Amino acid sequence: MELQFLGTGAGQPAKHRNVSSLVLKLLDEINEVWMFDCGEGTQRQILETTIKPRKIKKIFITHLHGDHIFGLPGFLSSRAFQASEEQTDLEIYGPVGIKSYVTNSIRISGSKLPYQIHYHEFDDTSMGKILETDKFIVYAERLAHTIFCMGYRVVQKDLEGTLDAEALRAAGVPFGPLFGKVKNGQDIELEDGTKIFAKDFISEPRKGKIITIIGDTRKTSASVRLAKDADVLVHESTYGKGDERMARNHGHSTNMQAAQIARDAGAKRLLLNHVSARFLGRDCRQMEKDAATIFENVKVVRDLEEVII
C-alpha cells in the first residue's frame, strides 16, 4: 500500500508544485488505484509515474474548487485512449454537482468514453460510511472550507492471521489437503491420531491500515474524528506558523494546526500537503521544524513523492 502525490500545491499550478491530486495504490490488496482530487495537469503528472490509468477505479473529490477538479475532463478523456489496455468502469465520489460538472464537460467537448462512470454524490445529509467493499470501508465528513468540502477516512479491514508453515511441518503435517485445511482454520487429525488445532499455528488477525485525507479546511473537530488513530494523516497546510488569521479568513489551515489535529487524533504520521507556492525548499524545512514541536513525525510532501504505508 502506497500513497503517491501528483500535485501538492495550493490554488494554482506553480513551478515546483502542481495543484491537488494524490493516489492511494492498493495494487497488492485489490489491484486498484484510488485517486483523491484531480486538479489541472494531473494527467501530465501521471506520465511521470508508473500508474496505469485503467487501474484507477475510484476517484474521490473533496470539493468543487477548480484546483481540485479542473483536471478531471482531460484525465477521463485520456483514460479512454488507452487502446492497448482493457477498458474498465470508473466510480466518482464527491459533493453534489460533480456529476453535472463532468457530464457537461464531456458533452460540450464532444468526448466519447468507452467505459461507464458511476457517480456517488453527497451532501450534509449523507455523511458517514460512503463505501464498503470486502477489504475496505470509506467514511466521509464535512470539513470547514468556504464551500462544501469532504474529508475521507479509508479503513482497511483487519487482515487474517498468517500460517506458521514451518511449525506445521515440524508437527508432522505434510503439504497437501491437510495443510490447506489448517490454513483455512480447520482442526485436523493425523493418521497416528495426533490432533492438530489450527489456532496453534495461525497468528492473531492483523490490524488494517487507516489513511485519512483532509481536503481544504479550517481547523475543525471533524478532522480529528476522521484522523483517529490513523497510520497516515494527509492534511492541508496552505499557511505557515503565525498565519492563523489569514488561514481562517480563507478557509484553510496552517502547519501548526495540522500538527495539532494529528496529535489530538493519535495519528502515527503527518504529511503536510496543499502548500502555498510561496513556501520553497528552506521554507518547507522550517514548516516541518515548526510543526514538529507539536507532532514529531511530520513531513512536507513534494510532487511525485511516494510514501509506503
UniProtKB/Swiss-Prot annotation:
Q: What Pfam families has UniProt attached to this entry?
A: Lactamase_B, Lactamase_B_2
Q: What class of enzyme is it?
A: hydrolase
The record's annotation in SUPFAM superfamilies points to: Metallo-hydrolase/oxidoreductase (SSF56281)
Q: Is tRNA processing among this UniProt entry's keywords?
A: yes
Q: What are the protein's UniProt keywords? A: Endonuclease, Hydrolase, Metal-binding, Nuclease, tRNA processing, Zinc
Detail which positions bind Zn(2+) 2: 67-68, 216, 274
What does the record give as the function of this protein?
Zinc phosphodiesterase, which displays some tRNA 3'-processing endonuclease activity. Probably involved in tRNA maturation, by removing a 3'-trailer from precursor tRNA.
Q: What is this protein called?
A: Ribonuclease Z
Organism ancestry? Bacteria, Bacillati, Bacillota, Bacilli, Lactobacillales
**Which gene is this protein's source?**
rnz
